[in-house]
A protein has these predicted regions:
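A conserved acidic beta->alpha catalytic loop
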Residues: 52-60
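Cell-envelope/extracellular polymer assembly enzymes that use nucleotide-activated donors
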Residues: 12-14, 47, 198
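Short beta-strand-to-loop acidic/aromatic patch adjacent to the donor-nucleotide binding site
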Residues: 98-110
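Conserved donor-nucleotide/metal-binding helix-loop-beta segment in metal-dependent transferases, i.e.
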Residues: 113-135
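Terminal low-complexity segments of carbohydrate-biosynthetic enzymes
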Residues: 11, 234-395
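Short beta-strand-to-loop element that shapes/binds the nucleotide-sugar donor at the catalytic cleft/hinge
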Residues: 132-144, 159
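Active-site nucleotide-sugar/metal-binding loop of Leloir-type enzymes
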Residues: 64-65, 88-101
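Short, well-formed alpha-helical segments that are part of the catalytic scaffolds
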Residues: 1-4, 22-38
Length: 395
């Protein structure tokens, strides 16, 4: 892939698409990206870069066939298998092509439109922002890692209401791409699912200008939080913990939070329903509590352990309420100050995450999207209000 990049003429804009076995959906994503580039940036030279993980289903071929005249580089990335390694290849492409700005979009999107490209890259091109995160309507059972930890913890630590810090679609400047490349993280979970939270946290901690782009509904291949999300959770949380240790001097003085500017008018849209099995979540909570019992003794406070164990024994996930959850998360974050084994810490939190998601499903039952969103924001506010507990344990 690097050889192909070296033979390519320089470009002003790059759209990066990481992929692995996405032949069924990536054609539509590529068509939307190429149309978005042509329609919104006709005077600028653009390249679509597909960084693939070695698909055998013809994924890169679908990209080449769907780009509709926009120059395309599609090939296998180097390094550890994972989304972050694909992003690293895209960052390298931005640098090698001497581009000004880049957008990255997921390869399984069914709701992407050409306007997404304009909203992700446009603020960078116009000099209004250095980093753009997505803002979309998601079903109340979708985005559970975001809703329970990535959003409220990022908001409380760094003081910015970035609603989708691990959304998958981003716009960023060439300078930021170079900064990401220079970080010594590519043998860690950042090479996998830790990449999104690494990008957002680094942007916030470095004080660059951040904006959010409203993209409508996100319709993709959703994941059942009970069935699919264990490895993603440990990678995202492990990365969050490592970064919290690195940037402690940045987040410790932060109080409250500020709004982050939104690009595009926010309009009401109805996302596709996402299934989530409370029964499976409670089973995983109970099994995980048994598995992590010794780790809880080492990491969690006595009060937190007692509530968690009782809830697991009785299968009463509703005991994992917002305030209890915020305290438990902060105990794990505080433990990361003196412990490098962030995977162990993330695994200790995983059963409580399953319990919290089961509880949250109950809390939003019968609510529409707006009502569910209020619950998520109330939880984020509780994280802000409980931050002194983290500072006390960190000291």
């Amino acid at each position: 892939m690097r050889e192909a990049l070296r033979t390519q003429r320089r470009a002003d804009l790059v759209v990066g698409i990481p992929s692995f076995r996405n032949a069924a959906t990536i054609g539509h994503v590529t068509e939307a990206a190429s149309e978005g580039l042509r329609r919104n940036f006709p005077e600028m030279r653009a390249v679509i870069v597909n960084a693939d993980g070695g698909s055998e289903d013809g994924t890169p071929d679908r990209v080449r066939a769907s780009a509709d005249g926009v120059p395309t580089i599609a090939g296998r990335y180097q390094g550890k298998s994972g989304k972050g390694s694909a992003f690293r290849a895209i960052f390298e492409a931005v640098t090698l092509l001497d581009a000004k700005a880049c957008a990255v979009v997921d390869s399984d999107l069914r709701s992407i439109t050409p306007e997404w490209i304009a909203r992700l890259i446009g603020p960078i091109v116009r000099g209004e922002a250095d980093y753009v995160t997505p803002l979309y309507a998601r079903h109340k059972h979708d985005g559970t890692i975001t809703n329970t930890i990535a959003y409220p913890l990022t908001r409380a630590l760094y003081g910015a209401r970035v609603r989708q810090p691990i959304g998958g679609e981003f716009g960023f400047s060439a300078d930021l791409a170079k900064l990401y490349l220079a970080e010594p993280v590519w043998d860690t979970d950042v090479a996998k699912f830790g990449i999104d939270i690494f990008m957002t946290t680094t942007a916030l901690a470095r004080g660059v200008r951040v904006a959010q782009a409203f993209l409508g509904a996100k319709i993709h291949d959703p994941k059942d939080p009970g069935a699919d999300l264990g490895p993603m959770f440990t990678q995202v949380v492990g990365t969050l913990l490592t970064l919290a240790r690195k940037y402690a001097d940045i987040w410790r003085p932060v109080t409250g939070s500020r709004d982050v500017p939104v690009i595009g008018e926010i309009s009401p849209v109805e996302p596709e329903a996402v299934n989530a099995s409370v029964r499976v979540l409670v089973e995983k909570f109970k099994a995980g509590a048994t598995e992590q019992d010794q780790a809880w003794d080492e990491i969690l406070s006595e009060d937190t352990r007692d509530v968690a164990r009782k809830a697991a024994e009785t299968g009463n996930a509703s005991a994992i309420g917002s305030r209890f959850w915020a305290k438990a998360v902060y105990e794990i974050v505080a433990a990361a100050k003196t412990r490098d084994d962030t995977e162990t810490l993330a695994r200790a939190l995983l059963p409580l995450y399953f319990g919290r998601v089961a509880a949250l499903i109950g809390e939003v039952q019968g609510l529409d999207q707006a009502g569910a969103e209020r619950i998520v924001n109330q939880q984020a506010l509780i994280f802000e209000q409980t931050k002194p507990y983290l500072l006390e344990r960190w000291a």
